[in-house]
Amino acid sequence: MTWNFGDILDTIIPVLPQGHLALVHGAREITWQEMDQRSNNLGRYMLDNGANFGDKVGFYMRNRPEYMETLAACFRARLTHVNVNYRYVADEVHYIFDNSDASVVVYGKEFRDNVEILRPRLPKVKLWIEVGDGADLPADSLDYETLTSIGTGENLDVERDGDDLLFLYTGGTTGMPKGVMWGHTALRETQTMALRALGDVPETLDELKAHLQTNGPGEVYIPACPLMHGTGLFTAMAAMMNGGTIVTLQAASLDSDELWRTVESRGVQNIAIVGDAFAKPMLAALEQNPGGYDLSSLVSMISSGVMWSMEVKQAMLEHMPQVMLADSFGSSEAVGFGSSITTKDAPVSTAKFTTNDFCKVFDENDNEIPRGSETPGFIAFGGPVPHGYYKDEEKTAKTFKTIGGVRYSIPGDYCLVAEDGTLTLLGRGSVCINSAGEKIYPEEVEEALKLHDSVEDALVVGVPDEKWGQAVTAVVKVAEGAEFDDKSLQLFVREKLAGYKSPKHVFAGGPPFRAPNGKADYKSVTEFAVQEVAKRA
């Protein structure tokens, strides 16, 4: 069976109840019938005005209804979603849109200044569509609301394919961000894999239609984490493809009180987060206002992308004992490595995951590591996987390997595999830093630091941090005759890169940075940085 998300939408929308909500943002409500027409109109406009099947559409927005509407329009018009981190500075955004060959960009009005910088540098972009109030619209931009209202709202007369693509750009572990190319069928299969273990799952469009007619529309979800990252996007997509309701929060960053108030007012059943970086402030709000929120509607919380500690899970369950906490182990390149389910009566250790038959653990020579071995290895997923990285055959070959006739995705996560198949995650085998779910490439920060007159050399590492998971930490060699000022270096990096890439700590001195061959000694520098951070604690 092949799947296409555009075909799924065309199939399920006619059987959803009139007035059933598709998208909610504060007081704003968009029904499924409204979203149906608006997304069809937008998709048709893009096709009629320069976009062709398979063209890339850049999404430059925070969490808001227009993100999911535009996604639906892309699915229906056979256009390819391209995410961009809205925290990026202009040069970083330019790289994503240029590398992806975007021909359309849909952006929030708040990012207009960056768009005006980028516009002359991106001649391949044919349509710039602004999401906002329509006021003072730049001459070369189109108003989103106007485009969604132009047309009859009828379904597009297009024949779709199971290999239509969705791009998910990831910071990765080395080099610049890479565009992971997911086919619709493979991505849909990742949504249904886990459900098959729980019972019958619709395996065809007709079965999906009958399922919704019998059981009614899907549940109410809050993607509390950004839609421009995989956890938020894939969770919201799963809700959408089951006729559910997607509620986006209004605050620009996590506001735990708003989140819990929204759960209460909207009867939210499921929340998606990114580990302790979200869970800890959410827990703090519960503890500051015990019994102050009605969370009786809540059924589950899912997390992926960064550690969600057992202690925080247990504390959260004291406030909502009926909720199932699902910790998913995956990456942009592989969804469904494993999971751990925590309930009030069944706690699970931090970073331990139950895996499935698609997963194997291999050593550096592609030999399978047997269960129960104390030897760490790389986790590999042999189920539905992406086609590879866009325009990067070399990195595709390194990450997506065929071993024993099976094509595996091997993003680089180290783990131990127990006798029962349980995985204990040890972390990335590379030097990539994961700070609150954001992947940070050290060399990029190092290069920014070395542009400063006072820095002769620099290495950047991740230091364990209670709040962030890992804190970006720089160790620099001060140039002869220069003065060391950690605050000025932090500000300097902020001017060059997105704020979350700026070091939380900067130290001077330490061990020799490099071996005689010039290779960076990240191990020694990390040990030094950990010691220095501890001194400040």
Predicted regions and their residues:
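AMP-binding/adenylate-forming catalytic domain of the ANL superfamily
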Residues: 131, 498-520
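Conserved pre-ATP/AMP-binding loop-to-beta segment of ANL
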Residues: 151-169, 175-176, 211-220
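Conserved beta-loop-beta connector loops within the AMP-binding
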Residues: 360-380, 419-420, 482-486, 520-521
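AMP-binding/adenylate-forming catalytic core of the ANL superfamily
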Residues: 88-95, 105-107, 261-264, 330, ...
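Conserved AMP-binding A3 loop
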Residues: 31-33, 165-201
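Structural core segment of the AMP-binding/adenylate-forming
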Residues: 48-49, 79-146
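Gly/Ser/Thr-rich phosphate-binding loop
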Residues: 241-244, 268-273, 283-347, 358-360, ...
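Conserved AMP-binding/adenylation subdomain of ANL enzymes
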Residues: 189-224, 228-272, 285
